[in-house]
Amino acid sequence: WNVPIFAVLQRSARAVVVDCADGRVLGTAVSGYPSGERGVLLDERDPHLARQHPGDYLEALRASTRGALDAAAREPGFSRERVVGIGTDTTGSTPLPVDAACRPLALDPRWRDHPAAQAWLWKDHTAADEAAAITETARRHAPKYLAPIGGTYSSEWFWSKIWNCLKVAPDVFDAAASWVELADYVPAVLAGVTDPRDVRRCVCAAGHKAMYAAAWGGLPDRAFLARLDPRLADLRDRLYEHASPADRPA
């Protein structure tokens, strides 16, 4: 057998062990997130806020993966040594601020309870004003950035959320060495990456959510970002230059 593990992270971590030869499911397990309401951190004062604690991802991923492997171990002939890879699936855009060691700020006691230091879940809509401003600025100065994404930038996406953080929680923005999508953070942890500059960024999140395209040199240029806020232009240098398709290992 060549056996991969697939892990899906949304309101819980769901792990599946599959036989590559025939697609047969050998074991499954689910582990919920302990924080917030069914895994989501809410704010009764703001119905648009939806965050998750980054520590929940790793705790639940560990538990669900072990559970799925334990279930697979009951299959005749299965061996953990036959596991050939781990694939992950997440919802996005779910960016999170990280320190210079690629550690989420929310894992630091200083930021543990700060809403802006959490993972900004895909369905967080607190950045509606920022999304509208990005759309209008792009229409006036760089319409090419909007062409691949339907002509409108969303409050659910990368730049609008980071810009909102800069406005409402500049201390968190200043403390972040970089920002990483959940889709990139989990594989980076599994691969032992400890520097945000070394995280392999997936082209799906980068392209659709962060307006990345090789045609214009990657992320939106500094001049465009500076029209939004000069500090976003500075952040660009701490993000990434290249994004990869899903068939590249982390």
Segments from the language model and where they lie:
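Charge-dense, low-complexity intrinsically disordered segments
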Residues: H48-G55, L121, T152, F173
